Amino acid sequence: MPFGCVTLGDKKNYNQPSEVTDRYDLGQVVKTEEFCEIFRAKDKTTGKLHTCKKFQKRDGRKVRKAAKNEIGILKMVKHPNILQLVDVFVTRKEYFIFLELATGREVFDWILDQGYYSERDTSNVVRQVLEAVAYLHSLKIVHRNLKLENLVYYNRLKNSKIVISDFHLAKLENGLIKEPCGTPEYLAPEVVGRQRYGRPVDCWAIGVIMYILLSGNPPFYEEVEEDDYENHDKNLFRKILAGDYEFDSPYWDDISQAAKDLVTRLMEVEQDQRITAEEAISHEWISGNAASDKNIKDGVCAQIEKNFARAKWKKAVRVTTLMKRLRAPEQSGTAATSDAATPGAAGGAVAAAAGGAAPASGASATVGTGGDAGCAAKSDDMASADRSATPATDGSATPATDGSVTPATDGSITPATDGSVTPATDRSATPATDGRATPATEESTVPAAQSSAAPAAKAAATPEPAVAQPDSTALEGATGQAPPSSKGEEATGCAQESQRVETS
């Protein structure tokens, strides 16, 4: 049955598990991600191989939301540089999403294997990403989690195309978005500054990707003591907010001025002045002959191995501490903020990041209930099973393996496994199959285009001092309106503002 059962509004209309196994052979699990298990599946009729993502409904609302969101977005898109949806089955217990199988390598691996690597190679990669993103933006879709890990080669042929994957955070821009999500090192200033944002955040992320591909260094990374995550976090967000990066020597000595110009325009701090994906495609470094043919492999590969082989920057980023600092001006007891975006919010956040509230003590994973991001400190050897990212079934926040942030079912933002920051479960707008935002039910295909106040988290095992109640604009939905909240919810949110998940 093509696309299985996708009319999830009728709760009684489910696929039987046998429908999946009658059509596909599911092999062993090849990868376990935050929300799902990934299989390599074979179509019994055609013999063609696909990727299958299996989401367990029992793993919680955030898992169900991620599955429904990915289905809704992927059904809207068809582009050669986007991994395409093949089939969908929804049983009473599971979602099965079948996608094209990309057999190529990640971009980093491809670069390391090349005998010759130049700006022109980078230009080819960035052009394909820009074309896919320009297409998404034409549909008013914001990916919100563009990063190198989500870019893969479709196959292992020499001229293989690049494809973008992982759409569980993508969102229709039915108005400016406020909820923070993404991967910390790729976050745009307006996301860090808790301002409303939209499609320009994807262009910023492409600028970060381009910077890394040309130098082997992330733009906002610096050496810190092994466990000094507090200073790393503070400096990371402060630099992002200020746009404080450099084309430092010797890494950029051989890079063309045209390449630097495009990076600068993609990483413009003011989102309304940032170049669009469509405009970037016409830039001389992409469409012209401005990209150099000089071999830069040795320098780039040396920095890639130094910065990324250790995976240090993918590790825990103490987002809760940073977000509390960044929100300090909003919580200082001044007049409550209105629904409109606050001018100068980024500047206030810079000041807060530089000398704001003290961080939570210890290397603990902390979850906030008012929209603050959850954090998890992680040392080099913390890949053990007891820090796994298995979603909790009781609605509680579950710590992850790399300290990044993913959605909880209680309105907080909790640690994830893929380095991404995902919003709380707010029933935000997700596209229906015909492109309309439709009301959500627990089993429906798409969440409704509204924001609601998330229920407070469970009582914390180790309570921390409460902080000021976040303002009503902290987790707005795609409509740009503040989420409604009752006095009871506010009181509960204040009383249970944070919880200690794990102490190292």
Swiss-Prot record:
Regions annotated as coiled coil: none
Primary localization: membrane
Region annotation Disordered: where it falls in the sequence: 378-504
Keywords annotated in UniProt: Calmodulin-binding, Cell membrane, Cytoplasmic vesicle, Membrane, Phosphoprotein
Entry cofactors: Ca(2+)
Polar residues bias locations: 390-431
Annotated CDD domains: STKc_CaMK_like
Localization per Swiss-Prot or TrEMBL: Cell membrane; Cytoplasmic vesicle membrane
Positions of post-translational Phosphoserine modification: S384
MF (Gene Ontology): ATP binding; calcium/calmodulin-dependent protein kinase activity; calmodulin binding
Membrane topology summary: Peripheral membrane protein
Post-translational modification Phosphothreonine, affected residues: T438, T462
GO cellular component, one term: cytoplasm
Assembly notes: Interacts with calmodulin, in the presence of calcium.
Role summary: Has no detectable kinase activity in vitro.
Family: Belongs to the protein kinase superfamily. CAMK Ser/Thr protein kinase family.
UniProt domain comment: The protein kinase domain is predicted to be catalytically inactive.
Protein name per Swiss-Prot or TrEMBL: CaM kinase-like vesicle-associated protein
